[in-house]
Each structure stands twice: as structure tokens, then as C-alpha cells.
Regions:
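Zn-dependent metallopeptidase/amidohydrolase metal-coordination segment
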Residues: 166, 172-201
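Hydrophobic/aromatic beta-strand patches that form the interior of the parallel beta-sheet core
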Residues: 54, 82, 100, 134-136, ...
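Flexible, glycine/proline-enriched loop segments at strand-loop-helix junctions
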Residues: 55, 107-116, 153-160, 197-200
Length: 229
């Protein structure tokens, strides 16, 4: 009789259709089932267990609401949750296409520590040679942040900002203890401010990088299933 525990599901949350499209068209060799429709789309991709990709919609309220609703499903009880998509870089020297691995996510309601940060950094560096990977706190906002406001957020120690990661992870841990992480791709930065995704080189570069991250997410998922020594 097989006494191994059931695989822990993985929930990958992104906000925008273009982010979901990048995930859908990436991940060669990992499978791409079930990513054609809005909302939550399930596919048994990874060795770690079943994987669901959720497009939450834009903004912290939509993200937290969507994640909480999905995690209420018994099939996703205890699911590991990874927030991904695009972000604005806050640190000087960042460029579109750089990667950000959160050590923690923050918003006015609280801070959530991420799991497996070092593994994610190592896997991204290995699978995407030449891409810069930044680590540090990722802060949440309820609006697009531009200009001087970015400097204020940088002064708090944050290295990037987006509207969904903090809400996604806070909503996830409020539904029960679970591994969580956030990996974002810089779409604009202090010296490379973007007006609209997809209209300039920075948006295209970020899209291409996001297409390439799924294998790293699956490796993180597999790793968080391993027993602690």
C-alpha cells in the first residue's frame, strides 16, 4: 500500500490576460493544458502535483477575493501559492526583463514571508543565464505607481512594486498555512518608465522572460513538497 501523502497542488496567480498568455505560451516540455479561458484553469503539469493557473483580475481586492474563493475548494486545500506577472522596479540600475524574487511581500495590512527564495534565485539564474535576478521585499499598491512615489517606496527598502502579489499571498495564508512565493518580471524601472505594456521594447522583453519561468515554478513546487531534514 502506498503510504505517501497526496501531492500538494500548486496555484499560480497572475492578474492580466497578457501575463496569462505568456505563461500559456511558455513552459515547453511542461505541458500547456487548460490555459485558454479566463479565471482558473487546471492542468496536471508538474511532478509535484496538480497545477492551477488563476487570472485574478487587476488590483489587490480582485486578487485577494479570487484567491480566497479558489482556495475554499477542498481540492486546493493546502495548495502552495505563487504570485507572478509584471512589476515596476524601484532600485536604480534595474532594467525591463530583470527578475524579482520576493523575500517577503508587504502592504498596509501585513507582511508575508516567502518560502524557497534561494531555490528560486538559483533556478532562475541557471535556466535564464544572463538575466539579472534581484531579491528583497516586494510592496503592494492599489494603483499604478509613477515618479516621486516610487522613490518613497524605495526608501522603505522595497525593490519592486505591483498591485497583486501582497494581496495574493496575504489572502492565501489567511486561508491556512501553506508555502507561498512571488516572482515578478520588471516591465519598467526608474530609468525605463513604461506607458503601456506591449508598446515598447521593455514590455516585449518582460513578456519573453515571463514565458520562460514555468519550469522554475515547477521545481519550486517539487522542492516545497520534500520533508524538512
Amino acid at each position: 500500500m502506498d503510504a505517501r501523502p497526496a501531492p500538494r497542488p500548486l496555484l499560480i496567480a497572475c492578474a492580466l490576460g497578457i501575463e496569462r498568455l505568456a505563461l500559456r505560451t511558455g513552459g515547453r516540455g511542461a505541458g500547456r493544458r487548460g490555459l485558454g479561458r479566463p479565471g482558473a484553469e487546471a492542468g496536471h503539469w508538474a511532478a509535484g502535483g496538480p497545477v492551477t493557473v488563476l487570472r485574478t483580475g487587476m488590483g489587490p481586492k480582485a486578487a485577494e477575493r479570487s484567491v480566497a474563493r479558489l482556495l475554499a475548494d477542498p481540492a486546493l486545500a493546502g495548495a502552495a501559492v505563487l504570485a507572478t506577472g509584471f512589476c515596476a522596479g524601484l532600485a536604480p540600475g534595474m532594467h525591463p526583463g530583470d527578475l524579482v524574487v520576493a523575500e517577503e511581500t508587504r502592504d498596509p495590512r501585513g507582511t508575508v514571508r516567502c518560502v524557497g527564495t534561494e531555490l528560486l534565485v538559483g533556478e532562475l539564474a541557471r535556466s535564464l543565464p544572463g538575466r539579472t535576478v534581484h531579491t528583497g521585499p516586494v510592496t503592494g499598491s492599489d494603483h499604478v505607481v509613477r515618479g516621486p512615489e516610487r522613490s518613497g517606496l524605495r526608501a522603505t527598502g522595497a525593490i519592486a512594486v505591483d498591485m497583486e502579489s501582497a494581496a495574493t499571498l496575504l489572502g492565501a495564508v489567511r486561508e491556512g498555512a501553506r508555502p507561498v512565493a512571488a516572482v515578478r518580471v520588471v516591465v519598467d524601472a526608474p530609468e525605463h518608465e513604461l506607458v503601456r505594456i506591449g508598446t515598447v521594447r521593455g514590455g516585449i522583453s518582460a513578456f519573453r522572460v515571463l514565458r520562460s519561468v514555468l519550469p522554475t515554478f515547477f521545481e519550486w513546487h517539487r522542492s516545497v513538497l520534500l520533508p524538512r531534514r
